[in-house]
Amino acid sequence: SHTHLSGTGHSDLGDILIMPQTGKLQLNPGTAKDPDSGYRSRYSHETEKASVGYYEVTLADNNVRAQFTTTPRVGVHKYTFHGIYNYDGKVLWSTLRVENDTLLTGYRITNGWSRANYTYFAISLSKPIKTYGYRDMKQLKYRGFWRKFDIYNNFPEIAGQGVVTYFNFDNTDRKPITVKVALSAVSTEGALKNLK
């Protein structure tokens, strides 16, 4: 994830988590004792490479090579497909909008080390999204009208307390997917400017 506090001794930011997966869709993190129960992955320190401003590792369970670097305003991810922290009550609200097949925007409001901490984001993808869907893991009871459309599959925007999103890509060319993540503490527009 893109934001962390160093040495706080308690829960930190952990905002805008991206976890590449292949195979069965996993929307929960799982446990350290049973990594197969969720999306977390095993890895070996032997596959790690690190230097100032750069880190890479192979996520063993899905055989995904994950590479990370940064610019002054953007975190850059690169995932090559071969083949978390989860504090309940931390997220007050989050929203994600699919602007087009390679651009995502949104924000998340968290509670913890500060009250109502806003993190806005813009995410650029090097490959177009084929299909996508959402799950709200903490659906709020709503006594309003019954929706006659499916908001959980290929719908452009969702909001909630426990929003989890997945994206499917056509990876027949086996080329890596580069993900650029820009953040702003001010606005989505600020995150979009930082992305450029």
Which sequence ranges carry the predicted segments?
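Accessory carbohydrate-recognition regions in carbohydrate-active enzymes
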Residues: 1-196
